[in-house]
């Protein structure tokens, strides 16, 4: 039954994904192919450069441009660009994958999907290098050439020889294709950063074009250098294999072998290979840039569908369903934009249903925003729990964060003073927040995100407590003083050592048994092995966790939380004058409670020893690294959202029922002391 229900959901997800992104994908591919003739023309002109005869140089270049063989290779290059664009579509991600250790980075690179990506790009790079070598003409055009020397008996040689220059071109293209794929995942180039300021697509492309060409020229130079070093040591292997397989001779009388220093110092060869690399990287980066521009363009989701058939694409339905992650991001981006710039659409959010008079639109939108923000609070609490226990969270038992209550119990109920959760969470983790379920194999994800299981598989390694924050347990660490927080493993061991009627009696009425001698012996041996391995430098080099990567992983999906903050706060501020039915007033206490609790969790996070308080300076580069500073943008957006509400409502917020801690914190915002 579950499978039958999930199939229609998957079908609806594919339908909405195609309706929203289908034309964008097609348009980006078409423009990538249309940009190819410009790149090909520039490549032909620079490959035949002759500064002493400029008129002859330009006339020959344009005459070759219209020749039949160039048109054929142009069609072949178009197929390559389409394949590269398809891989851009298949491997994109709205949440960057951040490995927390060098071993995790290696595992990310050798993943089967990544290996397939690298193999295809190496093959496409070889095809593009072959086309570039043939278009260049001259001594680089053919792999097999007639030998010019004589045989050992003194008669003219009739054999065919291997053209090592052409082989060098092909191998360089394969190397550049593989390097592009490797850097594609190492630098998170599949990550789609959404622009902060909405601009026209042409302006975004024009702004990136000069940086793209500069990046391609520099990267091609470094890749040619790396390949020359590699070919110097290992170039004889492919040369000997191809000459043996094709029964070709190697003519060393005309051209020096390229696996020597003198052979590699051929400036003409290096120039044409570098130019081929620039051509390859530029065309691939253009398709990549165009897909990013089209995929991250704002999309308008109707708040109220004009027809019943279009209800699946309305904003409240998309936010509360389980759409593909990019659709979720586009919906939250649209919520942020409508809350600021569209009074008519805000009225649709505040409207009541007919008949019935229920604020379904506001209820659905605010519920999802509060769930996202509560999920971020839970994630920060989990991270602080791991940091407080020196990165040690028990792997014997799954740790499950407290599930968010239903909206009827939390988000849409005016909190009583006796029922308000304490905003200051020292101890930041309460015993009811994490529960050890020994018989449940599944662990509830701490993300609190609306993404499906397939997306979570793609996000594997982004936030894994045992992966990112684990550290070898040593007796010195275990014997440290009293800790600020309580982990599930400590609670479990306390229950073993100090049994009480509430903990020693199971649900079936049976007494829990003490740990056996075998179990204690296994645990002791495991600790000894960990201590032994932690003293080995090479092992710790691969297994040690990078604190900055762990911090970035916590806020890797913070962009949608930023949009939820901005959208919710702008709607609440606008409701002061635009909400005719008072639908926002019923949820205002819950919204303030969520924001203030999250604010306290963020403040406690930034007070951790390894959490930097200032964003690093990011230089302008083609590869986007804005995800590294999302935590600072999230902190600023959260504080701005609270100030936006307090400055709008002013002293009216004193009538909102809240706990004493929240009232004190709210007063600081009202007095601009926060």
Curated annotation (Swiss-Prot):
Q: Where is the composition biased (Polar residues)?
A: 407-421
Topology of the protein relative to the lipid bilayer: Multi-pass membrane protein
The cellular component terms of Gene Ontology attached to this UniProt record, alphabetical and capped at eight, are: actin cytoskeleton; cytoplasm; membrane; nuclear envelope; nuclear membrane; nuclear pore; nuclear pore transmembrane ring; plasma membrane
Q: Which intervals lie on the Cytoplasmic side per UniProt? A: 1-24, 90-114, 187-225, 294-674
**What biological process terms from GO does the record include?**
homologous chromosome pairing at meiosis; mRNA transport; nuclear pore complex assembly; nuclear pore localization; nuclear pore organization; nucleocytoplasmic transport; protein transport; spermatogenesis
Where it mainly occurs, coarsely classed, is nucleus
Where do the TM regions start and end?
Answer: 25-45, 69-89, 115-135, 166-186, 226-246, 273-293
GO molecular function terms here?
Answer: protein-macromolecule adaptor activity; structural constituent of nuclear pore
Where does this protein reside within or beyond the cell?
A: Nucleus, Nuclear pore complex; Nucleus membrane
Report which superkingdom the organism of origin falls in.
Eukaryota
Q: Name positions with the PTM Phosphothreonine.
A: 414, 440, 449
One Pfam family, please name it. Answer: Ndc1_Nup
Instruction: List all topological domains (Perinuclear space).
Output: 46-68, 136-165, 247-272
Q: Does the keyword Transmembrane apply?
A: yes
Keyword annotations for this protein?
Answer: Membrane, mRNA transport, Nuclear pore complex, Nucleus, Phosphoprotein, Protein transport, Translocation, Transmembrane, Transmembrane helix, Transport
Q: What does this protein do?
A: Component of the nuclear pore complex (NPC), which plays a key role in de novo assembly and insertion of NPC in the nuclear envelope. Required for NPC and nuclear envelope assembly, possibly by forming a link between the nuclear envelope membrane and soluble nucleoporins, thereby anchoring the NPC in the membrane.
Additional remark text? Depletion of NDC1 from HeLa cells interferes with the assembly of phenylalanine-glycine (FG) repeat Nups into nuclear pore complexes.
Regarding protein family, the annotation reads:
Belongs to the NDC1 family.
Query: Can you state the subunit structure given in the record?
Result: Interacts with the NUP35/NUP53. Interacts with AAAS, anchoring it to the nuclear envelope.
Which named protein is this? Nucleoporin NDC1
Question: What organism is listed for this UniProt entry?
Answer: Homo sapiens (Human)
């Amino acid at each position: 039954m579950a499978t039958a229900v999930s199939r229609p959901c998957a079908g609806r997800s594919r339908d909405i994904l195609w309706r929203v992104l289908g034309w964008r994908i097609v348009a980006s591919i078409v423009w990538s192919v249309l940009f190819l003739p410009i790149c090909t023309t520039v490549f032909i002109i620079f490959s035949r450069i002759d500064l002493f005869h400029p008129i002859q140089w330009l006339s020959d270049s344009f005459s070759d441009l219209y020749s039949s063989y160039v048109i054929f290779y142009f069609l072949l290059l178009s197929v390559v660009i389409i394949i590269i664009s398809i891989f851009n579509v298949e491997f994109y991600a709205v949440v960057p994958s951040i490995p927390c250790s060098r071993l995790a980075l290696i595992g990310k690179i050798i993943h089967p999907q990544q290996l397939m990506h690298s193999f295809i790009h190496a093959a496409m790079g070889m095809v593009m290098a072959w086309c570039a070598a043939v278009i260049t003409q001259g001594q680089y055009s053919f792999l097999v050439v007639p030998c010019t020397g004589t045989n050992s008996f003194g008669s003219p040689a009739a054999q065919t020889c291997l053209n090592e220059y052409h082989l060098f071109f092909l191998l360089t293209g394969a190397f550049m294709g593989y390097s592009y794929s490797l850097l594609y995942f190492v630098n998170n180039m599949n990550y789609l950063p959404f622009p902060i300021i909405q601009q026209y697509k042409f302006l975004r492309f024009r702004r990136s074009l000069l940086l793209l060409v500069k990046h391609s020229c520099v990267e091609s130079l470094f890749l040619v250098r790396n390949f020359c070093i590699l070919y110097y040591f290992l170039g004889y292997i492919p040369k000997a294999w191809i000459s043996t397989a094709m029964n070709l001779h190697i003519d060393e009388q005309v051209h020096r072998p390229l696996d020597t220093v003198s052979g590699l110092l051929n400036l003409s060869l290096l120039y044409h290979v570098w130019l081929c690399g620039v051509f390859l990287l530029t065309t691939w980066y253009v398709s990549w840039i165009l897909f990013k521009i089209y995929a991250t363009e704002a999309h308008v989701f109707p708040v109220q569908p004009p027809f019943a058939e279009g209800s699946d694409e309305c904003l409240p339905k998309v936010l509360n369903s389980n759409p593909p992650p990019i659709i979720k991001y586009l919906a939250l981006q649209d919520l942020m934009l409508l809350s600021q710039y569209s009074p008519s659409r805000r009225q649709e959010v505040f409207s009541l249903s007919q008949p019935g008079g229920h604020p379904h639109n506001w209820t659905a939108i605010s519920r999802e925003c509060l769930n996202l923000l509560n999920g971020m609070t839970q994630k920060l609490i989990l991270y602080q729990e791991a940091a407080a226990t020196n990165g040690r969270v028990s792997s014997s038992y799954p740790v499950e964060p407290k599930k968010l209550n239903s909206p009827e119990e939390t988000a849409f109920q005016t909190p009583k003073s006796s029922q308000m959760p304490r905003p200051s969470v020292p101890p930041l983790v309460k015993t009811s927040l994490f529960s050890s379920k020994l018989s449940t194999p599944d662990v509830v994800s701490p993300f609190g995100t609306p993404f499906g299981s397939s997306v979570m598989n793609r996000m594997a390694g982004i936030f894994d407590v045992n992966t990112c924050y684990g550290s070898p347990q040593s007796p010195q660490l275990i014997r440290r003083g009293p800790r600020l927080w309580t982990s599930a493993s400590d609670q479990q061991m306390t229950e073993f050592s100090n049994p009480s009627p509430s903990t020693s009696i199971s649900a079936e009425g049976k007494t829990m048994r003490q740990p056996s001698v075998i179990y204690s012996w296994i645990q002791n041996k495991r600790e000894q092995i960990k201590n032994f391995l932690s003293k080995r430098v090479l092992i710790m080099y691969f297994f040690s966790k990078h604190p900055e990567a762990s911090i970035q992983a916590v806020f890797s999906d913070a962009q949608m939380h930023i949009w939820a903050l901005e959208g919710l706060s702008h709607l609440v501020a606008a409701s002061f004058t635009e909400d005719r039915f008072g639908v926002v007033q019923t949820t205002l206490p819950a919204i303030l409670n969520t924001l203030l609790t999250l604010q306290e969790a963020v403040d406690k996070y930034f007070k951790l020893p390894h959490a930097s308080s200032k964003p690093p300076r990011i230089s302008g580069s083609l590869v986007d690294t804005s995800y590294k500073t999302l935590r600072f943008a999230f902190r600023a957006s959260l504080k701005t959202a609270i100030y936006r509400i307090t400055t709008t409502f002013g002293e009216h917020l004193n009538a909102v029922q809240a706990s004493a801690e929240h009232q004190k914190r709210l007063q600081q915002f009202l007095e601009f002391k926060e």
